[in-house]
């Protein structure tokens, strides 16, 4: 149906004045890590689709790897519409990412927090920080930690938090 919407916009001369966004509020597990759900801070749940068609700013096929969050949506939509951003709104406008794709002036980390505890899904409370290379998860109900190197272990199967050579990584 997304294709039908895009075709309609094209056929009716509306493409140049319309920004189309396809996204979600989270990713979803399809058996990875033994889950068919969400709630954990693994990449399958943390990553969410964000596809945008904006002919005025973005060339077709453009791909960005910067860390964005759903708190960035409102500032982006406001700037795209030319509306002044209200005080106190969280997040950053992504418009600068489209104007300067290799910009170094973007966040290096994102924060995640799952606050429910052992509901019907059995997931303990946890929060964490994901950077470009590492992800640190804190299971604060039981003071447990997990650390993953997303460059060498993109499937997050090897917890490095107990290995002494990663002590400095945990501190920073």
Where would I find each of the regions flagged by the language model?
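Short alpha-helix within the catalytic core of nucleotide-sugar-dependent glycosyltransferases
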Residues: 3, 35, 99
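Secondary-structure boundary motif
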Residues: 11, 100-103, 162
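Active-site rim elements
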Residues: 57-68, 80-85, 156-166
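Beta-strand elements within well-structured catalytic alpha/beta cores of enzymes
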Residues: 2, 19-24, 50-52, 73-78, ...
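Well-ordered alpha-helical scaffold segments within catalytic/enzyme domains
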Residues: 1-9, 80-81
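C-terminal cap/loop subdomain of S1 sulfatases and analogous C-terminal strand-loop tails that border
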Residues: 26-32, 71-74, 79-150, 155, ...
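Histidine-centered active-site microenvironments of extracellular/periplasmic hydrolases
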Residues: 7-62, 69, 90
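Generic alpha-helical structural signal
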Residues: 3, 171-172
């Amino acid at each position: 149906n997304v294709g039908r919407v895009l075709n309609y916009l094209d056929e009716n001369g509306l493409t140049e004045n319309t920004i189309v966004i396809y996204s979600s509020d989270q990713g979803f597990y399809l058996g990875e890590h033994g889950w068919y759900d969400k709630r954990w801070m693994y990449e399958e749940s943390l990553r969410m689709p964000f596809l945008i068609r904006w002919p005025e700013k973005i060339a077709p096929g453009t791909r960005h790897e910067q860390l964005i969050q759903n708190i960035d949506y409102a500032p982006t939509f406001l700037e795209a519409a030319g509306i002044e951003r209200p005080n106190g709104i969280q997040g950053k406008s992504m418009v600068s990412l489209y104007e300067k794709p290799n910009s170094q002036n973007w966040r290096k980390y994102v924060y995640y927090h799952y606050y429910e505890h052992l509901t019907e899904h059995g997931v303990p409370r946890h929060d964490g920080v994901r950077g470009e290379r590492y992800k640190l998860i804190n299971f604060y109900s039981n003071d447990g930690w997990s650390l993953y190197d997303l460059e060498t272990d993109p499937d997050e199967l090897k917890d490095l938090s107990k290995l002494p050579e990663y002590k400095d990584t945990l501190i920073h």
